[in-house]
Each structure stands twice: as structure tokens, then as C-alpha cells.
């Protein structure tokens, strides 16, 4: 209307405003190593369900190497896609699932190859136990991912008392997360889903 005031209030040219969706974008990084594989299956089911809550979802699986699995969900039935993720390279899978966990290497690869996927509209969800088997946790990469994101959420099957034991670097990673939640079963994932829905609304 303000634009049309110069024409004595007579509508002359319609003025439209493009409405931009405020639904968040999701990036999910899922550890599928042996120690968290059962939980990873549940989480990948959750990822599939979350796609309707976000303007875009990009999904990645890692052990030490990291691969994008977004297209697997688009091109295959869910159970078949899950099989391709966890089957391992000898069985025609997309990832060496028998390697030792290396979150630091995976985060570095993600930042180098896919870092542009994260911006201030992106919520990053990480599933992992934070165990690097003595390798460099690459906190600089974790910090940079978190800095770029709208929110960083870490889901872990590890009980809190074990976070500082052995090769677990989760306490260090937690410093760069907005929320860390213990998820060990379907009920825990449902609670995480409820919290994620609140963020998306």
C-alpha cells in the first residue's frame, strides 16, 4: 500500500512479499561403528521421519571415513537403505564399518567437503559415543561446525558416568554443543524427537 500512495491510494501495481520458510535445515552425522550400531539404526529411522519437519535434510554416516547417505533415503526403501549403510564394503555397502571409530577424522572430512551445508539456519545432530581410540578428536573442526550452525545437538548411547573413561572424548565435544542427550533405546529417541519438534516449530 505504501508503494501505491503516490497514485493517490489507487492500486496500480501489486506489491508482493515472498514468504521464506522458517523451518530449519538439518544436517545429521551418524556414527555407525559397532559400539553404536543398534542405536544408529533407530536414529536413521528418526532421520527419515524428521524430513517432514525441516526445509532440507542432509544425512551422513561415518566410522572413520564419512559418506553422504542422503540419496540412499531418496532412492531406496528405508530398510534397504539402512542395509547399504551398515553392510560394510565387502557386502556392497557404502562405508568400511569395521574400521576403528575416528570422530575427529570424520568431522574434518565433513568440514572440508561439506562445510557449506551448515549455516545459521542449520541444526546439526550428531549421534556417536565420542570414542576416538586415542586419535586426535579434532576439536577445531567440531568448534567450527558448531560456530556455523544454528544449534548443535549430540545424541549418545553412553551413560554420563562413562563419558570421561577410556578413549571417550565426549566431555570435550560437549563444550561445543547446545545440548547433549543420552539416547539408548527407542523411548530415548522419542524424547529427542519431541525436543527436535519443538525446535522446528
List PLM regions with ranges.
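Exposed acidic/Ser/Thr-rich ligand/metal-binding surfaces
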Residues: 104-151, 181-183, 195-201
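Negatively charged sequence features
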Residues: 1-24
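…and closely analogous acidic/polar surface helices at protein-protein or active-site interfaces
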Residues: 23-24, 30-65, 74
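Short acidic, S/G/P-rich loop/turn micro-motifs used as interaction or catalytic elements
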Residues: 35-37, 66, 131-134, 161
Amino acid at each position: 500500500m505504501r508503494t501505491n500512495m503516490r497514485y493517490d491510494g489507487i492500486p496500480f501495481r501489486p506489491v508482493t512479499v515472498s514468504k521464506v520458510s522458517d523451518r530449519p535445515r538439518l544436517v545429521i552425522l551418524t556414527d555407525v561403528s559397532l559400539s553404536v550400531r543398534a542405536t544408529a539404526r533407530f536414529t536413521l529411522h528418526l532421520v527419515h521421519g524428521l524430513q517432514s519437519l525441516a526445509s532440507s535434510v542432509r544425512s551422513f554416516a561415518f566410522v572413520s571415513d564419512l559418506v553422504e547417505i542422503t540419496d540412499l533415503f531418496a532412492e531406496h526403501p528405508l530398510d534397504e537403505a539402512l542395509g547399504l549403510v551398515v553392510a560394510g564394503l565387502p557386502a556392497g555397502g557404502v562405508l568400511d564399518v569395521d574400521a576403528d571409530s575416528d570422530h575427529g577424522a570424520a568431522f574434518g572430512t565433513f568440514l572440508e567437503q561439506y562445510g557449506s551445508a551448515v549455516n545459521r539456519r542449520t541444526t546439526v545432530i550428531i549421534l556417536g559415543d565420542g570414542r576416538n581410540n586415542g586419535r586426535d578428536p579434532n576439536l577445531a573442526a567440531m568448534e567450527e561446525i558448531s560456530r556455523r550452525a544454528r544449534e548443535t545437538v549430540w545424541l549418545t548411547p553412553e551413560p554420563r558416568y562413562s563419558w570421561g573413561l577410556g578413549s571417550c572424548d565426549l566431555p570435550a565435544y560437549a563444550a561445543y554443543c547446545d545440548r547433549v542427550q543420552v539416547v539408548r533405546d527407542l523411548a530415548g529417541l522419542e524424547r529427542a524427537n519431541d525436543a527436535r519438534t519443538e525446535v522446528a516449530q
